[in-house]
Structures are given as C-alpha cells and as structure tokens.
C-alpha cells in the first residue's frame, strides 16, 4: 500500500482549493487504512490542467515558481497509467465565462474527438461531442496503453448513453474496448411531469439537472479485435437521491450479486437503450393524406 501511495497513485487538479481538498482526502484515506503512527505526505498530486497535458505543445504550469509541481507533472507524463478514475466536468451550454468549467481550447484533443467520435457519428450536429466530459473519455481512452490494456472509470453526465449526437462515441467505445459496464443512475431533470418523477433524485443535488452514469471501460489485449460486451444496469424508477446512493454503496463492486447486468447488443444506429426498430418511416408524403369536409 505504501509503495502504491508514494509511486503509483497520481492526481491532477487545476483549481487551487480542489487541489488541497484532494490532497487531504488522499492522505486521510491512506492513513485510515494503514493506521500509520507517523505522517507520510502524499507527493503524487499535480496542480495542472489534465487536458493540457495531451497537447503536443503543452506549457508546464508555473515551472519557474513551482518547480516541484513541474517535476511531478513530468514524472506523471512518463508513467505507464493503466487505470484512470475521475468525475469529469461538463461544460457545453455554460452560462458565462465565470462558470467552473470554462470552455478552453485544446486543439489536439478536439482533433482526436473529430477524427473518432465525430467521424463515426451519423448526426449532422456534433456540438455535444465537444463537452468537457466527452473530451475526458477521449483523453483517457488515448492515455491508457493501447497494447497492454487498462480501465477507464468515470462518473459523468449520462446523456451520452442514448443521445443521438453521441452515436459515434458509443461506436468507438465498442471498437476500442472489450468490456463496458454502465450503471445508469438516471436523475434527468431536463424533463417534466411524470417522466421527471420517474427519473428520481438528482445525484449531485440541486446543482445538477443531467442524468448521471457510472461507466467502466475495460480494454483486455487478449480480446483485441473483438467488439465490446456491453453490460447495463438501470438503477430504477422513482428513487430518491438517498436511495440511489445507498444502493451504489451496497453494490460495492461491479461483480456484486445485487447488480443484475443486462447484456446489450447495439443496433445499426448504435442505439444501446431505447432502441429504434427501424420499422417506421416518416415522409413528407404523409401531409398529402387529407380529409376534406364539404
């Protein structure tokens, strides 16, 4: 545990307050688990923009003033990372430049989204693919070793699971990974009436209106070339936030017997849930069928 704590656990934060909170939390968990009598500081946290590290011409943050931080960033970039865990922000539609997740420019990462998720999408409007949480999935998918495999585990905006504009994203997940686990926590409050009540409590409280998913993307090099097996679990209807969180806590693991995974086979439109059957065809000719009243 001490070896992993000191050498194998890395953390990035760009907001100073969040940086210190994350540092304290990691140190607290380590000391609670190990029951050490002497304090051992955590040295794996970096004050940096994770997405900026993917850019070919990235700038080392505050190199002159924070040399230790710069060394940590260099060490992390040289490290083989096989498991990435996070809660990425989402930023499309932010109301002002003062919002927490500002829409910064990441040319290389945007290019990667364009040549993967956007290329494989049949949607004509791809704005939603440039949301920060989508970029996080793209960055993490590229960051894990392509030949050795790894795991990406995110709790994120869940709009991608059935969004028409994210069909290319779902196609890429199937092509790039071998196993996919999606726990749909629902909570979509961009709805109204009975549908809103069915969606249940908002996972992140009053500040959240989007649906939330916990997603595990597994890349197993032994199964290279095979389409991913998609495991899906819907948390259920009419549940409060507290009920949902208790259920997640009780699950403990994706191998839990309490989790009844449904195996999904996507259709040719890359629908995973709420699949279209393709039987209905609507044309403008329907407007010609009129009933005349004399």
What spans do the regions from the language model cover?
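SAM-dependent methyltransferase catalytic region
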Residues: 1-182
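Substrate-binding/catalytic lobe of Class I Rossmann-like enzymes that use SAM or dcSAM, i.e.
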Residues: 154-158, 196-199, 213, 219
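Class I S-adenosyl-L-methionine
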Residues: 181-214
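A short acidic, often aromatic-flanked loop/helix-cap motif at beta-alpha or helix-coil junctions
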Residues: 51-55, 188-192, 238-242, 269-271
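E2/UBC-UEV (E2-variant) core
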Residues: 110-124, 239-272
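Single conserved hydrophobic/aromatic residue that forms the stacking wall/gate
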Residues: 282-294
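Flexible, glycine-/basic-rich loop-and-beta segments that form/coincide
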Residues: 202-251
